[in-house]
Amino acid sequence: MSDYITFALPKGRIMRDSMELFAKIGITCPEMSGDSRKLVFENPETKFRFMAVRATDVPTYVEYGCADLGVVGKDTLLEQGKDLYEPLDLKFGYCRLVVAEPGELSRDEDPADWSNIRVATKYPNITERYFAERGVQVELIKLYGSIELAPLVGLAERIVDLVSTGATMRDNGLVEVETIGEITSRLIVNRASLKTKHQRITRIIQDLERVLAEDAGND
């Protein structure tokens, strides 16, 4: 199977967006149509394989060479810090990584005055780096879901989380006070694969660059 090019893709919307983009450069997999519960899909004619994995696991599959390429959010790459080649911003999956707090705190405090705070987040590494650069001492509480709940029940005064529209935060009485960064989906490549399958992988990257440039020109 070493002649296959293998992609690791997050299950759900990012996988669908990825396959729509790949189709524009002739990379397709008819086996993926429908609601299959399979986790590995192949196109024997074109020698492409696709693995459906958890978003946070994509970098690991690519790092260890189980996949040659992957698509993953920049937030995951920043949090995990793995040694991966990241040639392309794919321009979809846009959201923002923000610091948020209850509205009453926002009215009474200036973020510039923070010195020692408690923050709940799925992104402890990013959060620690961000506040360390500002000279703010932070106590981190790692959660895996429903981050907005933490300030409501007194677990933490503030949170760091991804937002797209911000509706969930507003519905829970939270306001964004700082933006850590803008997040989009990225193409990542295993460094060994880039050498052993250089021609095919380079062609994929170049074709995607062309399509992304064309799409940007049409906006």
Swiss-Prot record:
One GO MF term, please? ATP phosphoribosyltransferase activity
Q: Which reaction does it catalyse?
A: 1-(5-phospho-beta-D-ribosyl)-ATP + diphosphate = 5-phospho-alpha-D-ribose 1-diphosphate + ATP
* Record's subcellular location: Cytoplasm
Question: Which residues form each disulfide bond in the chain?
Answer: none
Q: Name one Pfam family in it.
A: HisG
Instruction: Offer one example of a GO biological process linked to this entry.
Output: L-histidine biosynthetic process
Pathway assignment reads: Amino-acid biosynthesis; L-histidine biosynthesis; L-histidine from 5-phospho-alpha-D-ribose 1-diphosphate: step 1/9
A single Gene Ontology CC annotation of this entry is: cytoplasm
- Family label: Belongs to the ATP phosphoribosyltransferase family. Short subfamily.
UniProt comment concerning the protein's domains = Lacks the C-terminal regulatory region which is replaced by HisZ.
Main function: Catalyzes the condensation of ATP and 5-phosphoribose 1-diphosphate to form N'-(5'-phosphoribosyl)-ATP (PR-ATP). Has a crucial role in the pathway because the rate of histidine biosynthesis seems to be controlled primarily by regulation of HisG enzymatic activity.
Q: Which named protein is this? A: ATP phosphoribosyltransferase
Organism of provenance: Syntrophotalea carbinolica (strain DSM 2380 / NBRC 103641 / GraBd1) (Pelobacter carbinolicus)
